[in-house]
């Protein structure tokens, strides 16, 4: 379970980063 939790956390972090990056990109494009 420990390893699974770690993997899940890593995946969530990656998704969050991607979302932030996309938002920034959209903001830049808007400008």
Curated annotation (Swiss-Prot):
Tell me which family the UniProt entry assigns to this protein: Belongs to the 2S seed storage albumins family.
Q: Which keywords belong to this entry? A: Antimicrobial, Disulfide bond, Fungicide, Plant defense
Give a short account of its post-translational modification.
Disulfide bonds.
Q: What is this protein called?
A: Antifungal protein 1
Tell me where the signal peptide lies: none
Q: How does it assemble?
A: Heterodimer; disulfide-linked.
From start to end residue, where is composition biased (Basic and acidic residues)?
Answer: 1-10, 18-31
Which terms does the UniProt entry file under GO BP?
A: defense response to fungus; killing of cells of another organism
Q: What does this protein do?
A: Has antifungal activity against C.gloeosporioides but not against B.cinerea and Fusarium sp. or against various yeasts. Has no antibacterial activity.
Q: What is the lineage of its organism?
A: Eukaryota, Viridiplantae, Streptophyta, Embryophyta, Tracheophyta
């Amino acid at each position: 379970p420990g390893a699974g939790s770690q993997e899940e956390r890593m995946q969530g972090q990656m998704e969050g980063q991607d979302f932030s990056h996309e938002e920034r990109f959209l903001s830049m494009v808007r400008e």
